[in-house]
């Protein structure tokens, strides 16, 4: 006892006392700085709630009242921007840069003033502040695009984006369909194309072209000869300043934009979206983020997704409503990493195609067994933290493994949202582990403005698209031909709410095909309610066909499964009603193919590998293996493939501006190879 008493109460030696104090301080600092988990806000086993008529709403929504707006002073896109001007205290708004230079910024007031001057110019030229006044915007993402769009909203006009790569014939169709008499475009090359169409009497209604970039007198004279007035954007703004008109803002129910969706077949369809459609979708997004992420004037996003995407425009609207900043990429996707490092965005909207490239590059750089082991261990360890609600980027694994990836995206991303196409489980899991920020997957289409569902904070499982957002309900309807029935929690995804469009411009027949008498939008996608109340996309109603034996084929579903194959960049699955099997066209990934081929003992250039029969056989076997793992039936598996070295792209006419396959064009482009594949198998 005496020994214990002496040990406890005798003075400690100075070194021991210092060690004890140091240890105690370290424990105290760890306790107050340890990462705090963010707990789920809803029951993750019951993420959506059934309502009358078989529809469902998100569980975070307290009742069946659908949201119309988030801020009472921002019910139109004009008011959204004015709110941003106020809350930012006229802070920086739109940023741009030249190669190897920092971003330069235009303030909110400068943007607002320039929009008013441009709009005043249009009124001075005789254009009306009317719902029937459609203004074409034909440009790549840049500050002037936003200024032109805001000019429309400031004077109750309607913006009609003419997508950069919509195609010459589609541009003519849209201009005529929407009776567009004025187009604001970026380059002399586009202006020349517009003038040529007028010279050929293909777009007789076009009267004015306003050009963002400098142009010469020859172009102006050429325009004058065919009745086109050519104006520089600078001159148009000066003219509007001299003949200023007070803003004539729209009402929430007024049209804001006609977004022509470039279909995979047929002519583009003009989806009519109101200010209320877009603002309600923005409001639902802000409501969803409210408990975990509140955008501020300090937030910045990068604009690189085509402004053909309503997804991109929705994110921009959210940023504007909170006074944040938008920086534009230089126009070359290859320079995007450099732009990201210079801009350091905090909000990053993205698409699986880009994330797949980053993921594949990281995987390919882990060449040795030790590097692969460390990478996989880092992913598992970090993702375990994420599953426990810990979102951070200051862990040991961040310093050792993930800091380079984070830095390549600017190093300050707080929020990532992926949409426009399905994302694979490994890729989504990787980014949730690697980025140390909130990463969500959203689902929607232009006809419901942008998004109708999104994954929930705290649910870090993959393979689904979350639950309905608070501006719409979702239900599943029977598709008997494909054996999908709502009683089995399967069917066509239908959406009803404040974000659902008003129909297609001058096309009541197409409108009735997708918008029923009760206001439900029929998406053409097949979904399944999972036991936890989340929505999973399982099939596609459109673009289906029958094989000779009567089996229905949904090629997009098969392509989504095959996209998980490591050596694959793109795949096109083709079938015909007089054939009993499928064939495919495969574009390998240039970064993954060499290592894939090396495993079977084949080396060579990318083009040589694409022509090698052993490589072709190995790719086909890998596709069939991935297909079997993905649950494809035997008749859904391709029997042969053609390996093509050049990617499908917007430029070669094989993808739409929203990066969807143009199936008719692909079949025409590869008709010789398709015929050869069928003949070789039938022999």
From Swiss-Prot:
Transmembrane segment boundaries: 12-32
Root EC class: ligase
- Give the protein's recorded name: Long-chain-fatty-acid--CoA ligase 5
Q: What is the lineage of its organism?
A: Eukaryota, Metazoa, Chordata, Craniata, Vertebrata
Q: Where in the cell is it found?
A: Mitochondrion; Endoplasmic reticulum; Mitochondrion outer membrane; Endoplasmic reticulum membrane
Anything else the record notes?
5 rat isozymes encoded by different genes have been described. ACSL6 corresponds to isozyme 2 (ACS2).
Described purpose of this protein according to its UniProt entry: Catalyzes the conversion of long-chain fatty acids to their active form acyl-CoAs for both synthesis of cellular lipids, and degradation via beta-oxidation. ACSL5 may sensitize epithelial cells to apoptosis specifically triggered by the death ligand TRAIL at the villus tip of the crypt-villus axis of the small intestine. May have a role in the survival of glioma cells. May activate fatty acids from exogenous sources for the synthesis of triacylglycerol destined for intracellular storage. It was suggested that it may also stimulate fatty acid oxidation.
Q: What GO MF terms are annotated?
A: arachidonate-CoA ligase activity; ATP binding; long-chain fatty acid-CoA ligase activity; oleoyl-CoA ligase activity
Q: Which residues carry this modification: N6-acetyllysine?
A: 361
């Amino acid at each position: 006892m005496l020994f214990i008493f002496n040990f406890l109460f005798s003075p400690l030696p100075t070194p021991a006392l210092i060690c004890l104090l140091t240890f105690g301080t370290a424990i105290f600092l760890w306790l107050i700085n340890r990462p705090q988990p963010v707990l789920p806000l809803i029951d993750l086993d019951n993420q959506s709630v059934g309502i009358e008529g078989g529809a469902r709403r998100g569980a975070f929504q307290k009742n069946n009242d659908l949201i119309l707006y988030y801020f009472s002073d921002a019910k139109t896109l004009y008011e959204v921007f004015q709110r941003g001007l106020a809350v930012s205290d006229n802070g920086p708004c739109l940023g741009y840069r030249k190669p190897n230079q920092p971003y330069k910024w235009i303030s909110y007031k400068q943007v607002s003033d320039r929009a008013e001057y441009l709009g005043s110019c249009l009124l001075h030229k005789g254009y009306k502040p009317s719902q029937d006044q459609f203004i074409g915007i034909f440009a790549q993402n840049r500050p002037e695009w936003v200024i032109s769009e805001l000019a429309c909203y400031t004077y109750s006009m309607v913006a009609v984006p003419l997508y950069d790569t919509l195609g010459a014939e589609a541009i003519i169709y849209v201009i005529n369909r929407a009776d567009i008499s004025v187009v604001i475009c970026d380059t002399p090359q586009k202006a020349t194309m517009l003038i040529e169409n007028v010279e050929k009497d293909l777009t007789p209604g076009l009267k004015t072209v306003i050009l963002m970039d400098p142009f010469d007198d020859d172009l102006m004279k050429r325009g004058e000869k065919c009745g086109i007035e050519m104006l520089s954007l600078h001159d148009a703004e000066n003219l509007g300043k001299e003949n200023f008109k007070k803003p004539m803002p729209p009402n929430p129910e007024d049209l804001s934009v006609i977004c022509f969706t470039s279909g995979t077949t047929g002519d583009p369809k003009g989806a009519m979206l109101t200010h209320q459609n877009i603002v309600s979708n923005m409001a639902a997004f802000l409501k969803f983020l409210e408990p975990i992420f509140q955008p501020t004037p300090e937030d910045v996003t990068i604009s690189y997704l085509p402004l053909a995407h309503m997804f991109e425009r929705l994110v921009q609207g959210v940023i504007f409503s909170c006074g944040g900043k938008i920086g534009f990429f230089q126009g070359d996707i290859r320079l995007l990493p450099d732009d990201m490092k210079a801009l350091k965005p905090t909000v990053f909207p993205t698409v699986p195609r880009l994330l797949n490239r980053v993921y594949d590059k990281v995987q390919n750089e882990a060449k040795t067994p030790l590097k692969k082991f460390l990478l996989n261990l880092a992913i598992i360890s970090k993702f375990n933290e994420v599953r426990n609600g810990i979102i951070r980027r200051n862990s040991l694994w961040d310093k050792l493994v993930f800091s380079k990836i984070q830095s390549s995206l600017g190093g300050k991303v707080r929020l990532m949202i992926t949409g426009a196409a399905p994302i694979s489980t490994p890729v989504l899991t990787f980014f949730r582990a690697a980025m140390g920020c909130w990463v969500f997957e959203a689902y929607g289409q232009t006809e419901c403005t942008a998004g109708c569902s999104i994954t929930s904070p705290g649910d870090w499982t993959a393979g689904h698209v979350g639950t309905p957002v608070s501006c719409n309900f979702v239900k599943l309807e029977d598709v008997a031909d494909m054996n999908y029935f709502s009683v089995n929690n399967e069917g066509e995804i239908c959406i009803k709410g404040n974000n659902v469009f008003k129909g297609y411009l001058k096309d009541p027949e197409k409108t009735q095909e997708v918008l029923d008498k009760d206001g439900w939008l029929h998406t053409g996608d097949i979904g399944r309610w999972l036991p936890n109340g989340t929505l999973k996309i399982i099939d596609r109603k459109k673009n289906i066909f029958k094989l000779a034996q009567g089996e229905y084929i949904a090629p997009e579903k098969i392509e989504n499964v095959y996209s998980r194959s490591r050596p694959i960049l793109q795949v096109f699955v083709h079938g015909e009603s007089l054939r009993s099997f499928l064939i495919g066209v495969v574009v390998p990934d240039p970064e993954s193919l060499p290592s894939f081929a090396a495993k079977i003992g084949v080396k060579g250039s990318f083009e040589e590998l694409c022509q090698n029969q052993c490589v072709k056989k190995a790719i086909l076997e890998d596709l069939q293996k991935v297909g079997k793992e993905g649950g494809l039936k035997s008749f859904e598996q391709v029997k042969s493939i053609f390996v093509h070295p050049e990617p499908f792209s917007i430029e070669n006419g094989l993808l739409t501006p929203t990066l969807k396959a143009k199936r008719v064009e692909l079949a025409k482009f590869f008709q010789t190879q398709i015929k050869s594949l069928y003949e070789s198998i039938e022999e």
